């Protein structure tokens, strides 16, 4: 009898509430969430200060500078050969690619051209640096979303690429191999054949990643439609590289503004995606790793014979002048503006790196997203803090 009475009471209360159309509005108190500066999703010492309304981001502010090293100022008291040891440490995952545009700018001022063999080897090592960089992105993207297996595959196959780079340059992460007028050394015997075998392993890795991540329903749900960047916004924020191409912008400096490298001599494709979301950014970089293996195979088959160093003075004094060179680096456009007054050292060095723009868009991109999607978006933008804190 008691149970029936209780049920009747509940029905009566519910009816009264419905009749009175009682609306209960819940108010939430905003909070501030600090992501970083020590956080695996920020690839270094980046801090994101996010203001939340419940689980939703209402504002986000990126704060960099915790690792600033002052490379542009230090370069003013270093010789041109010594500057390459600095720029190696900007994007430390693709070090050789950082050297090339600086050396090309110095060569333009000196009116020196590297021999064809050196140009082809430069391009080959440039693409190997791209693979070494992007392989880690492909594995790390899975880790940020809770899938740890892909990163083990990434480290496994990245070692093969780094071993080949080390055989030529002597350095795995900081080669310091490029020189004004060419390269420090020639290729060791059998290196090209071994490199082509490594490219077969990299292609297998790409297939594994595609199966593990892109074939996962969870990965698709966590990335599709998340962090969409329209083409006009990408242009406004100066995005470049894969981030721009993932928003449908068909622009690649290797094809559209190639200087001093052998890309026009080989057959390759620029990949774009129309969606502009986190999935598109992952997909474009996966295709770029595959395309890099094609480029390397063609370069390995066609490297011309001859010297790897032009005749330049032992002590380099770059003539007075100004030069700007930018290249399509793994993270996007990397450019150097070199000003010389005819001394042993640059008078001024301005570095344009891609990661600063990649991070600059986060206040616009994170507004309105939910907390779990913050890490997805940061991982898909892909930046290295050494590329920002120079």
Predicted segments with their positions:
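Active-site bordering "gate/hinge" segments
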Residues: 2-47, 51-348, 352-390
